[in-house]
Amino acid sequence: MGEVVATLKIMPESPDVDLEALKAAIQAAMPAEAEFHKIEEEPIAFGLVALNLIFIIEDGEGGTESTEEAMAKLADVASVEITDTRRLM
């Protein structure tokens, strides 16, 4: 099997959320089977900034589910959504 790079958009609950603390929580919550790559900030509107988590996983059953579930459980997270997946060559 190969590897897949995935992008997970993480929406904070409000513009008042401490993004640096949330970034640290995201890195700490990464499942063992997922390899952290980077986090990019994406301005949305009215001061709200989404975090795009880019990570690498093995291409297999379950895929991104464990990472999605781990991020959805974090405090100050309103929603999570996979926005991109690509197979690495």
From Swiss-Prot:
Pfam families linked: EF1_GNE
InterPro entries with a match to the protein in the record: eEF-1beta-like_sf, EF1B_bsu/dsu_GNE, Transl_elong_EF1B/ribsomal_bS6, Transl_elong_EF1B_B_arc
Keywords annotated in UniProt: Elongation factor, Protein biosynthesis
GO molecular function terms attached to this record: translation elongation factor activity
Presence of keyword Protein biosynthesis: yes
Family from the record: Belongs to the EF-1-beta/EF-1-delta family.
Protein role: Promotes the exchange of GDP for GTP in EF-1-alpha/GDP, thus allowing the regeneration of EF-1-alpha/GTP that could then be used to form the ternary complex EF-1-alpha/GTP/AAtRNA.
Protein name: Elongation factor 1-beta
UniProt source species: Methanobrevibacter smithii (strain ATCC 35061 / DSM 861 / OCM 144 / PS)
Gene: ef1b
